[in-house]
Amino acid sequence: MSPSPSRGALSALLATILIWAYSWVVMKQVLAYAGPFHFAALRYLLGAAVLFAALLLSRQSLRPPPLLPTLLIGLCQTAAFQGLEQWALLDGGAGHVALLAYTMPFWAVLLAWLLLGDRPTARHWVGVGLAAIGLACIIEPWHDMGSALSTTLAIAGGAAWAAGTVLSKRMFHRHAPPVLNLTAWQMLLGGMALGLLALAVPERAIEWNLAFTAGLIYSVLLASSLAWWLWSIVLQRLSTTVASVSSLGVPIVSVLLAWLILHEQPSAMELVGIVFVLLGLLAVSGVGARRRG
């Protein structure tokens, strides 16, 4: 891998972490004004519209990538992941749900090994182990984890995202679709599935006000359209292990933002866990190894 693509992927990863970290706070706030499935469907259908507009403006092809794998990616990565996490946020704190959702890397590492032959190195296993210890310290499964339903939904959403991540990586390996094209089509298909779910599940009417509209705009333009496009770039250029474990930066920043904005104060154990996760990220990224080299 040349330095330039790698640097571009790392820049995309950093931007994605910052955008998604704040989006958990936004999602928690907007659910005071809308049901989880209606909001998720709106967010992703509008996000897909933005991406298709970007395709038109950049004069890229609107022809869909291979339909079945694109549909599977959309169902896992958009419909299942976002639907389950939005549902979990109804009873769970933003920081806590974000942390449970980011069990994703551990599922992704195993799925990538089984389905892609992307076998982790010894350094990767060390990083995964440190991050797992950190996540356990943050979640504290030996204590009351709050709503059992919220916890289960958040973890299931993380597993669905892992499946979408590995399927996306396999799509890039086998078919090499343009990143923006794949992101737009999987978001449209996943958003349509969320739309059908929103129609089938009775929910409160959306309360259209300034707070909801501002949250929806952030979610559509940044957290959906821009961030998922950047995430696809990351998956295209980095290994599944490095990309997925590095995404643990999102819940770390999310916990800190939830502390500052929603007053969900982290415990001492959560702060210890954050340190372990950061050590795991350093191990997986190989920063120290590159410097010694």
Segments the model singles out, each with a brief description of its role:
Residues A21, L45-A49, A132, L188-M192, ...:
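Small-residue-rich packing faces within the transmembrane alpha-helices of Major Facilitator Superfamily
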Residues H38-A49, Q77, Q82-R119, H124, ...:
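Specific alpha-helical transmembrane segments that line the substrate/conduction pathway
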Residues M1-H38, H143-R170, M192-A193, R292-G293:
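Glycine-/small-residue-enriched transmembrane alpha-helix faces in small-molecule transporters
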Residues V30, F39, R43, A88, ...:
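Hydrophobic/aromatic residues within transmembrane alpha-helices
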Residues A40-L42, Q82, V97-T103, L167-G191, ...:
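Helix-helix packing/entry segments at the starts of transmembrane helices
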Residues L51, L111, P120-E140, G158-A159, ...:
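Hydrophobic transmembrane alpha-helices of multi-pass small-molecule transport proteins
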Residues I19, S23-W24, F52-T103, L111, ...:
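Specific transmembrane alpha-helical segments of multi-pass solute transporters/efflux pumps
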Residues L51, A108-L110, G146-P202, L216, ...:
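Transmembrane alpha-helical segments that form core, pore/gating elements
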